[in-house]
Amino acid sequence: GVAPANAPQLIRSARELGYQGLISTETAQDATVLREGAGDLANGFISVGGASTPKIASDTMKEFVSRYTKMFGEYNDESNTKVYALEYIIETMKANPASINNVAEFKKTMDTFSAPNIYMKGDSKLKYVGTTSFGQKRQVFVPMVVNEYQNGKFETLFIAEVD
């Protein structure tokens, strides 16, 4: 992945050197930083973003966005990933209270854990994934929101899941 602060210069350099192909990253980015650092040269840039998009965001997620914006002055795609961490920890420990003081119990709980995802509309669940890629469930599940940067903002291309 590419750090949001580095993406504009990398995009700008590639475009100014004549590269016209696809540029993408597997990390969430900040449209404001791209606009300020690369401008129209960033058009067409694709990133796999944070954890939500307005189309699938629940009222709880919208409240988080509002509170985050008030506290930090702006909200961006990268910020979406921050909402989930504490919810996963708390819900996993509620599913198995022994996991509060026992890492082995926490890991065991990850294999079967599921809880309602309060940040998304519909019946999405909090769960751990990673079996296919890593042979064990050690990654928190968040929807993969694939975005394309165009004219100063991100447009969602599609939303996907991994196992």
Model-found features: residue ranges?
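Extracytoplasmic ligand-binding clamshell segments of periplasmic binding protein
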Residues: 5-8, 77-78, 132
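Segments of small-molecule ligand-sensing domains
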Residues: 70-76, 91-154
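Hydrophobic alpha-helical
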Residues: 1-17, 85, 89, 147
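Short, basic, helix/turn surface patches
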Residues: 1-3, 49-57, 103-107
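Solvent-exposed, polar/charged alpha-helical surfaces in well-ordered, non-transmembrane soluble domains
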Residues: 8, 12, 62, 66, ...
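Extracellular/periplasmic periplasmic-binding protein-like sensory domains
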Residues: 13-84, 95-97, 157-162
